[in-house]
Amino acid sequence: MRIAVIDLFCGMGGFSQGAIDAGAEVILSVDSWDYAVKVHKENHPDVKIIKMELGHPSHYRMFKRLVDEYRAKGYHVHIHGSPPCQALSNASRRDASEGMPLVLWFLDLVERCDPDSWSMENVVPVRKRLPEGTPSVVLNSADFGVAQTRRRCYAGEGWVAEPSHSKEDWLGVINVLPHLNDLIGYAPANSMKSHFKHKRIQDPFPTVTSQSPRQLRLMMDSGRSSSKTSGINPRTGKKEGGSGPLFREVNQPSYTVMSSPRVLKTDEPQKIRSLTLPETLILQGFNPDYKLDSAKTQKNRWTMVGNAVPPPVAAAVIRGVQNGVFN
């Protein structure tokens, strides 16, 4: 049975890309942001995409007709949605209730359209605000081969996303961006290995010696260096409150990709350079050649990349649908 996907609040096309990678047919994508629609169309010219402000009850009938049409053709129809989530994020100071209307609208749409399966991606805090009985899980992108520990709530039915990577096998930034080794260019001297052995990435740098320039480790800024809402204590690296610089070595998965570039630093730390957009696309699970020119400005590009669903996670959801349909 063929799988048809309707992708709502589609952005630049992360879920659409993953669905296509998994062998599904995306029959419609919808978003209200003109630049995101243009980028989506540029990368998926064969997918019908509509620029439309979602959230009105009058839209239910339109999507119900589409579900019925493709079901009659023998398709399994899957509806996905990624309603805007800024007010629901842990990093937001806005009232979280501001972010719920479109979430509830989407859930109502699913109930009225009755697709064969559905999924909704949002930030983790939305999970506790979902109506009672709404099935949901928290998925970590690193479990699906993405070099980033991006955790998101996925509500839905008709699928189970099976991880492809255990924690021991998570991809580090350096695994997917091996050219960053050129910024390191050293192996710690044997005499220093025990000195570094018990040092965490949050600890002060050891005694500076003539070998120090070759013993600096390349690290990635979390992007939350002064956030008071991250809940991370920079001294211990644990979720116990606090704010301040927070870094992770590049042999580990990236922090969640957001709408601004990650900064590469040394262990002092001292900025080397920011990650480029093609590098950040890779950290999100996209092909680095994914076309962003239609977005016009760098700010628009960073925003849509930071908001995108990592395609490998979307592909895992659709493969979960396939496993349920074909087994």
Positions of predicted regions on the chain:
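Conserved SAM/SAH-binding beta-strand->alpha-helix loop
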Residues: 33-34
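Class I S-adenosyl-L-methionine
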Residues: 59-250, 255-256, 272
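A short, Lys/Arg-enriched amphipathic alpha-helix followed by its capping loop at the start of a domain
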Residues: 18-25, 43
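Class I SAM-dependent methyltransferase "Motif I" SAM/SAH-binding loop
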Residues: 8-12
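Extreme N-terminal starter segment of soluble prokaryotic enzymes
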Residues: 1-5
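S-adenosyl-L-methionine
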Residues: 38-71
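Acidic-aromatic/histidine active-site loop/patch
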Residues: 314
